[in-house]
């Protein structure tokens, strides 16, 4: 993973997943940590995508938090502070996100690539989470198209340009 190929929001999400792992006293970063980090990003794209997909955020976040709580904790004198591992499924998802960015002809790996990769390479926990909410790659791509349009990721802060008109414009017809 080359950090220079990731957008600022993507790197923030990865760092937040690491922090969440430490706070929850988990031994390794799992896909659920990365998903939770993507959901909790301030003005994040993933919550926007989920809303466009017709998903109630509060309900989905509660389900994610419940799964986080089920992860084994490592405490006591044998635990080395701030030492954790990256689960193989997370490594696979990060590598896949880079491939997805290339397929979409984007120059940087953005949060949408991370989210799509988590959907595509979901471990058992995420598959069980996504199934009742009908979160699929196709639904996500459709939501992404409505948010992003034909824009490509050509800077390390592309999320700021998505739906700029809706954020900063005024509808004079209303």
Per-region residue spans from a language model:
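Histone-fold recognition with a strong bias for associated Lys/Arg-rich disordered tails
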Residues: 1-174
């Amino acid at each position: 993973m080359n950090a220079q190929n990731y957008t600022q929001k993507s790197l923030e999400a990865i760092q937040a997943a690491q922090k969440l792992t430490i706070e929850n006293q988990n031994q390794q970063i799992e896909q659920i940590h990365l998903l939770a980090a993507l959901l909790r990003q301030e003005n994040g794209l993933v919550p926007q995508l989920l809303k466009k997909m017709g998903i109630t955020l509060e309900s989905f976040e509660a389900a994610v938090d419940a799964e986080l709580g089920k992860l084994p904790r490592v405490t006591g004198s044998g635990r080395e502070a701030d030492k954790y591992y990256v689960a193989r499924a997370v490594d696979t998802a990060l590598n896949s996100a880079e491939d997805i960015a290339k397929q979409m002809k984007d120059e940087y790996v953005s949060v949408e690539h991370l989210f799509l990769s988590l959907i595509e390479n979901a471990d058992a926990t995420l598959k069980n989470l996504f199934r009742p909410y009908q979160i699929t790659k196709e639904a996500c791509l459709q939501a992404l198209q409505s948010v992003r349009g034909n824009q490509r990721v050509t800077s390390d802060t592309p999320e700021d340009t998505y739906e700029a008109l809706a954020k900063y414009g005024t509808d004079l017809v209303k």
